[in-house]
Amino acid sequence: MDLPGPIHEILVLFGGFGLLLGGLGVVLLTNPIYSAFSLGLVLVCISLFYFLLNSYFVAVAQLLIYVGAINVLIIFAVMFVNGSEWSKDKNYWTIGDGFTLLLCITIPFSLMTTIPDTSWYGILWTTRSNQIVEQGLINNVQQIGIHLATDFYLPFELISLILLVSLIGAITMARQ
């Protein structure tokens, strides 16, 4: 970023202090939830340093990928750690359970109706004639987006489905 000197130095000091505090929290805290939050703080501070170094794409990727992965880590930690006394004593049917049931019923039916009607051949062999491919007009981020939307569309979607199935499997294993 093009920031004035004092503001840039304050942000660097804030990021360094956050890194030290978060690193100590990861090592010293015994609760896995607090430790995962501390690791999230470390990763957000690293992303701040990428922003300060004018590497915006890497900073956003750091936030989306690594901090998002920390949220998954928190979910796994909550699932595998013993539940609280309240969750063992009371068994209520909540609005969230009904909403989840509705989603679990409607999503497979919508997939069964849309997947057979999709022209997969047209998706796999999308031409780039209607896109700007002149190297001077697009940057690296746009090139990554073009490749994900054309060449790697089907593998990208398959990987997301595999991750979804693994998350559902982990939730099922944790409940048993």
Curated annotation (Swiss-Prot):
Name this protein carries in UniProt: NAD(P)H-quinone oxidoreductase subunit 6, chloroplastic
InterPro entries registered for this protein in UniProt: NAD(P)H-Q_Oxidoreduct_6, NADH_UbQ/plastoQ_OxRdtase_su6, Nuo/plastoQ_OxRdtase_6_NuoJ
Lineage: Eukaryota, Viridiplantae, Streptophyta, Embryophyta, Tracheophyta
Subunit details: NDH is composed of at least 16 different subunits, 5 of which are encoded in the nucleus.
Enzyme Commission code(s) on record: 7.1.1.-
Chain's role: NDH shuttles electrons from NAD(P)H:plastoquinone, via FMN and iron-sulfur (Fe-S) centers, to quinones in the photosynthetic chain and possibly in a chloroplast respiratory chain. The immediate electron acceptor for the enzyme in this species is believed to be plastoquinone. Couples the redox reaction to proton translocation, and thus conserves the redox energy in a proton gradient.
TM segment ranges: 10-30, 33-53, 60-80, 95-115, 152-172
UniProtKB keywords: Chloroplast, Membrane, NAD, NADP, Plastid, Plastoquinone, Quinone, Thylakoid, Translocase, Transmembrane, Transmembrane helix, Transport
Keyword presence, Chaperone: no
Record-stated family: Belongs to the complex I subunit 6 family.
Subcellular location: Plastid, Chloroplast thylakoid membrane
Top-rank taxon, per record: Eukaryota
Catalytic activity entry: a plastoquinone + NADH + (n+1) H(+)(in) = a plastoquinol + NAD(+) + n H(+)(out); a plastoquinone + NADPH + (n+1) H(+)(in) = a plastoquinol + NADP(+) + n H(+)(out)
Any GO MF annotation of the entry: NADH dehydrogenase (ubiquinone) activity
Record GO cellular component, one term: chloroplast thylakoid membrane
Major localization class: plastid
Membrane topology qualifier: Multi-pass membrane protein
